[in-house]
Amino acid sequence: MCIRDRSSTNGVMTAVANDETAIGYISLGSLSNDVKAVTVGGVEASAETVKDGSYVLSRPFNIVTNGDATDPVAVDFIAYVLSKDGQAIATDNGYIGEDGADFTSAQPEGKIVVGGSSSVSPLMEKLIEAYKTVNPNAELELQTTDSTTGVSGALEGTYTIGMASRELKDSEVEGGAKAAVLALDGIAVVVNPGNTTDDLTVDQIKGIYTGELTTWADVQ
């Protein structure tokens, strides 16, 4: 059994797809036929099961700023992604969004940089594309790195808006980081398509990642 725990979503999927003994976890919204998602406790990962709580593995997709956003484009864009229109895009792409409020752009001009989590990035790319049709005056650059870089980049000014696929750490909040939940994401536990394992319990997943279970025979 080989645990694939990489900072890149694509890196995890590639590694699992090429190793019949591998296991990893990725964003539900990034799931493809290259890997197989196992059920957890007999429950399939889906937007519906995450929302109703029957699928227990989920995480927030956070947008992060250094304190309250002040850049006009950032303020307008954040309002958009949290609006009814932005949340509908999240829902349409397999994530769990909220109802959101109506949105009217203030049409600010300027450039912002959004960067961070590779799990959040596919959804953010779609949101940026949609926002540009609403406000063509704005320029938004997307940089895909990881959650920790997303938070530190927002605090240091490298990014106007950071992306993190986790809760903020106490030290990050104490440093001035402020988060808003963009959407809720199911965490898909994935194995190679050739693996005959179809279901794992939460305890088995914990055992795999703590090293208590080291072969697939241990979970049969």
Where are these regions (language model features)?
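Exported/periplasmic ABC-transporter solute-binding proteins
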Residues: R4-Q220
